[in-house]
Design a protein with these regions (language model features):
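Metal-dependent phosphoester/phosphodiester hydrolase catalytic core
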Residues: 1-408
Length: 408
């Protein structure tokens, strides 16, 4: 339909479980490249393994998508999980266009606000051949964070003081463009500034995935410490909290993975855009996670690789652990980066943080009935070109039943 920018969201039925398939699209005489995916195992079946890539934060203008080049070349890849900031809304100008050899037209030089501008921004980012290769390599699922609309927006509120009526329209067109361009079910078609991107699926009896919306239903960032500690504050909203709680409580899977946009483990109470800004909501979620086997949080947002063991008590972290959190660095946001970029001491001062690396890259995760192996890959440069080789900065094993990150 022209009203949906000619995007299609087909529901294909009757495919055999656990089977590799290839597909392409035809429009007139035009044929797309061939894509590949593997259907999920049958309900109750336990596959020998299931592997996925974890990526986020791909500011096209900050550098080449070298991480995607390496991810697409992974031999063992059943799924790609995008955990937010698939696009960025900022105007692209001489001050932030660090991708050498790239040029953009006038339409990209202003902050995007209209449906056509959001559509054009997706088209620009998706023109990257390495991102195209990732989508062709394996099935993908996605959640959003903030830049799919506006930096640090909270629920219906703009971070820059745009009036609620005007901002509601901006949310509506941003959500529409996200739906048009991302692998969402037809049930997620937005109605104005409202939609439901939460989704869940099971990898047989091996794993249960729950995709969370940590942006649309959240309360505003707190004005002071007293408000921050209020018991009724939420980041997921009441209905979504109940939904994920039911999924965790009813799960019989060995691994229970949640994907969301912002960091869960306690790091800094001043980081109010993360779960640190919603401590009561975090306590509720951790109580729900404790009901399931081997909970794992998948996160992006911070443009750093972080691997952390989740404290059972986030308010007074001791030695008891509840699960693990895997935070992937950015594909391109913040440019080349460096191993110690940012404020590593803010993170590494916590005993439960086992890795911090500020270079660009992705995470590859392999699940088996016995263990989870998480491999954190990095590249040293992305601004000059896309030729940087990948390096393994860290690999951890998490045995089933033991919420630890053991260097491997």
């Amino acid at each position: 339909q022209p009203g949906l920018a000619h995007s299609v969201h087909p529901r294909v039925e009757g495919l055999e479980p656990g089977t590799e398939h290839f597909y392409r699209f035809r429009v007139g005489r035009e044929l797309s490249p061939v894509g590949r995916f593997r259907t999920l195992p049958a309900a109750g079946e336990t596959p020998e393994s299931f592997s996925f890539g974890l990526v986020s934060c791909q500011a096209w203008y900050h550098g080449h998508f070298t991480a995607h080049r390496h991810l697409a070349a992974e031999e063992d890849l059943d799924l790609v999980v995008f955990v937010g900031d698939y696009i960025y809304e900022y105007g692209i100008t001489g001050t932030n266009l660090w991708r050498q050899g790239a040029e953009v037209g006038e339409a990209h030089r202003v902050e995007i606000e209209t449906l056509e501008q959001y559509r054009l921004r997706y088209a620009l980012f998706k023109s990257d051949p390495h991102l195209q290769a990732v989508h062709a390599r394996a099935a993908a699922v996605a959640v959003w964070d903030d830049h799919e609309v506006q930096n640090n927006y909270t629920g219906p509120l703009s971070d820059t003081g745009i009036g609620e009526e005007d901002f509601a329209h901006r949310i509506a067109v941003a959500y529409r463009a996200f739906y048009e361009n991302m692998p969402l079910d037809v049930a997620a078609l937005p109605e104005g500034p409202d939609t439901d991107i939460t989704a869940g699926f099971d990898v047989g009896a091996l794993a249960r995935f729950s995709l969370l919306d940590s942006r649309q239903f959240r309360d505003a960032e707190p004005a002071d410490a007293a408000e921050q500690q209020r018991e009724d504050r939420t980041i997921l909203g009441t209905e979504q909290e109940e939904w994920v709680g039911e999924r965790l409580a009813s799960s019989e899977a060995t691994w229970n993975l949640l994907a969301n946009g912002v960091v869960l483990v306690p790091i800094n109470e001043k980081s109010t855009d993360m779960w640190d800004g919603y401590p009561a909501a975090r306590r509720r979620l951790l109580a729900q996670m404790a009901e399931a086997q081997n909970p794992v949080m998948l996160t992006g947002d911070i443009h750093k690789h972080v691997a952390a063991e989740i404290p059972a008590d986030p308010d007074e972290p001791g030695e008891e652990r509840l699960g693990v959190e895997l935070v992937c660095t950015s594909v391109a946001s913040d440019g080349d980066g460096a191993e110690d970029a940012g404020t590593p001491e803010t993170w590494t001062q916590h005993e439960y943080v086992k890795l911090y690396d500020g270079r660009r890259g992705y995470v590859h995760v392999r699940l088996t009935p016995e263990e989870m192996v998480s491999s954190f890959h990095v590249v040293d440069w992305i601004e000059a070109d896309d030729t940087a080789p990948k390096q393994l900065t860290a690999r951890f094993t998490t045995p089933a039943g033991e919420p630890r990150l053991i260097p491997a």
